[in-house]
Amino acid sequence: MDARELIDKYHMNTYSRFPVTLVPGEGARVWDDEGNEYIDLVAGIAVNVLGHCHPAVVEAVKEQVERLIHCSNLYYNEPQAEAARLLAEAAPKDLNKVFFCNSGTESVECAIKLARKFTGCTKFIAFEGGFHGRTMGALSATWKPEFREPFEPLVPEFEHVPYGDVNAVEKAIDDDTAAVIVEPVQGEAGVRIPPEGFLRELRELCDEHGLLLIVDEVQSGMGRTGQFFAFEHEDVLPDIVCLAKGLGGGVPVGATIAREEVAEAFEPGDHGSTFGGNPLACAAVCAAVSTVLEENLPEAAERKGKLAMRILSEAEDVVEEVRGRGLMMGVEVGDDERAKDVAREMLDRGALVNVTSGDVIRLVPPLVIGEDELEKALAELADALRASG
């Protein structure tokens, strides 16, 4: 039996997969078990910001795996110390306390607990279209009914309002509201960018009412949108930030970053993770964060994003909308089946893309993708869109 047959037989039926088994990868390219080569515009769903098997991450993991893989948080470990320092220094001033976990949804769970503990309140305001994870707390903040309804009742007191509508947020605030949780760019909803000034207005509103502002940077962080954090486009300081995906350069890891005043609400025993902050994952964090900063990959993402939008504009007449920020882009085609057909067609054309929100082709390539690779893959996508239109 091959990998596909084994997974179909033994793995729970939780994923809709393309009929491709990926084996090796390097940079922005991957190969399947039949030797076919693909330019990767999915990057493990925005995880591989440094591409596949980046030498800095590979070397850091190799070195650490021979030294100390895991020791729990009963003890201090050096990679965790260095990773926390790097993140605190990469974040804007006052965001200087870090909690490490293993995934994006865990980082959101931490943020929810911390906001409750700090404020003493239990209500959260989230947004229509928002996606924050699939564990029970993060799922409560998530909007999509298909994700939520099979598992209700969820955590109570999460109210969803239209994305980008500050007036709706203000109307939803009551005396028991702890925080507003928001994505600076909604990824799962089809790469939706809020109106300019939205985050600033949210910050002002939270300050006015004594609420915390939680910004979910799980998909948009690590330089993807042209800044290390997407909220930096509006020069806003959140109280809590959720980070994962690209944080480990492909190694599973998440982090919750908070202002010191807020973080001090936690005491030993309030929250924890057996694997969170383990030496192996944190060695990868050190390599990934250092590389993103030293190679100025946010600037590269902004530059390549502009190139991508120019190429995709050639297909604007056969789609509903092309939108994006940096290397986080969405092509809304207006028809669910057409979007799926184009994604499958792209396999034959030698590129990986994925579909989100039904009819949006999401493009989140590695930040290190070569401009020639980007041009080649997007030219094929533009051609496939025209052919399907």
UniProtKB/Swiss-Prot annotation:
EC nos: 2.6.1.11
Segments passing through the bilayer: none
Superkingdom in the source lineage: Archaea
GO molecular function: identical protein binding; N2-acetyl-L-ornithine:2-oxoglutarate 5-aminotransferase activity; pyridoxal phosphate binding
Keyword NAD: no
Residues at which N(2)-acetyl-L-ornithine binds: R134, S273
Residues with N6-(pyridoxal phosphate)lysine modification: K245
Keyword vocabulary terms for this entry: Amino-acid biosynthesis, Aminotransferase, Arginine biosynthesis, Cytoplasm, Pyridoxal phosphate, Transferase
Cofactor section: pyridoxal 5'-phosphate
Details of cofactor binding: Binds 1 pyridoxal phosphate per subunit.
Compartments where found: Cytoplasm
Reactions listed under catalytic activity: N(2)-acetyl-L-ornithine + 2-oxoglutarate = N-acetyl-L-glutamate 5-semialdehyde + L-glutamate
GO biological process: L-arginine biosynthetic process
CDD domains, per database record: OAT_like
Protein name in UniProt: Acetylornithine aminotransferase
Species: Methanopyrus kandleri (strain AV19 / DSM 6324 / JCM 9639 / NBRC 100938)
